[in-house]
Amino acid sequence: MSKLVLVLNCGSSSLKFAIVDAVSGEEHLTGLAECLHLPEARIKWKLDGKHEAQLGDGAAHEEALAFMVESIIASKPEFAANLAAIGHRVVHGGEKFTQSVLIDETVVKGIEDCSALAPLHNPAHIIGIKAAQKAFPALKNVAVFDTAFHQTMPEEAYLYALPYNLYTDHAIRRYGMHGTSHLFITRVTAELLEKPVDELNIINCHLGNGASVCAIKNGKSVDTSMGLTPLEGLVMGTRCGDIDPAIIFHLHDTLGYSVEKINNMLTKESGLQGLTQVTSDCRFVEDNYGKKEEATRAMDVFCHRLAKYVAGYTATLEGRLDAITFTGGIGENSAPIREMVLNRLAILGVEVDVEANLKARFGKEGVITTANSRVPAMVVSTNEELVIAEDTARLAAI
């Protein structure tokens, strides 16, 4: 147990954590705190069986981290004794960070400086980093950036049609997120299809409270739906994704919204939350589709947007699409959403295997299209934690 890495993945409304052997890939502990900031905030973990505890109404990342360290890890003294390093998923590195780095005060400051580009995530990452440094002061911490995988995007994909000096002077461009997940899915899909990674063309749909699509050509990211920030692209839990930019001016000039109110609305009150005006939880939308108007409306918009992105990204792959892959909490578990999206892609020759699709959830992976489908669609469980553990072990020299 000499190369154990504690991996922390602080999302906008969740905290995934794991203790991973960076050599064997074995996970000794896995857990998820979810629905943070909501009344039903809870934490689940697997360690000598499955466990669950309520964190309290509105509990945030700090409470989840404290519970993890004081109640879960503390129950196994050998874990703390054998932890060699701590790896952190960081959503946005801007142009400051193009690869994983050892964390010091300068890196923390750099991550904080990028918070304007990921306002729901980077502040949560800082909380995780500082809590980890306090709990385990002798261990090295490593930051693994979601933006790194997308550094291979060509200029035509990452530039916005704005005055060019905004890029050269202020680095305003598309960066993309979920890169660690997109990288892992690329590797696994290549193995499943028995193709070399550098010959693989896929479109990967990472669907969770945050969601993005990535066009992967010859194993490298060539386009992705998130942009300068995680706000662009798909409909998400609380984020709007693509909108007409002029809506912002209309809200400000005509309706009198402040800039702060608009920013808060687009990042925290839109997406599924805004469309339902009930919740950001996709499970409510799925369970009530066809029963409640707000759920039906939200799911239709979500699937319409996603299918458009997948279809559009076929244009970046120069005539060959080896697979469409689904991952993330929604991608891995929502058979209805996958079916609705794939049915909208019939023009690509996609044909859903309804039975296989229904079975592919709760950790079960596999092909969810028929043998007649021109393009296979697959459910593949992501493992960002393993990628983070491997990078952490390398940089911490453990």
UniProtKB/Swiss-Prot annotation:
Signal peptide: none
Known catalytic reactions: acetate + ATP = acetyl phosphate + ADP
Residues reported to bind Mg(2+): 9, 384
Top-level taxonomy: Bacteria, Pseudomonadati, Pseudomonadota, Gammaproteobacteria, Vibrionales
Cofactor: Mg(2+); Mn(2+)
Presence of keyword Ubl conjugation: no
Keyword Metal-binding recorded: yes
Enzyme class at the top of the EC tree: transferase
Protein name as catalogued: Acetate kinase 1
Details of cofactor binding: Mg(2+). Can also accept Mn(2+).
Record's GO cellular component terms: cytosol
